[in-house]
Amino acid sequence: MSYAEFEADVVVDARDCIVGRVASQVAQRALDGERVAVVNAEQAVITGSEEDVMSVYRQRDAVGSDRGPNYPKRPDRIFKRAVRGMVPYEKTRGREALGRVRVYVGNPYKDGAASPRGEDGEAVEAEVLEDTSLDRLSNIKFVSLGDVSENLGANVTW
C-alpha cells in the first residue's frame, strides 16, 4: 500500500515525544475509529539511560528460538508493536484498530500531496499530542528509537 492509499484522519508527529505516551493516545484514537498516521518514528524517545534501555531490548531479543517470539528492529515497527500492546489485538475490534494505524520513518506527508485535508481543503499539519513531549521530563536520560534500532542491528535507511 502506498502512502497515498492511506487517508489518515489525523497525522501525529512523534519527534521528541515519549513512545509510550504517544502510543497510548494513538491506540485510543484508533479504537475510537480514527485513522491515525504517525510520522518521524525514528525521532521518538524512550526514557532511561541507553544502557538500561538496550539491556531490555537485547534480553528480549536473546530469549526464544528461530520460531519466535520475534521482535522488530526498525523504529516504525517498534512503535507499532508498542501500539499493538495497548489494543486487544487478538479480538476483531483490536485488529481493526491496529489496521487504522500507520507508522512512518520520516514524514511522507511533508510535501502536502498526500496529506489529509481539513474542512477548508487545506492540508492538515502533523500535530504533537498533549502531554507527550520530551520537555516535560525532569530526567535527562533518554534514547531515540533510531538509536535503539541501530544498536539492534537494523539497516539504517533514515
Map each language-model feature to its residues.
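Ribosome large-subunit tunnel/peptidyl-transferase-proximal elements
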Residues: 1-81, 88, 131-158
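Mid-chain, well-packed structural core segment of small domains
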Residues: 69-117
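Strongly charged
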Residues: 94-95, 106-156
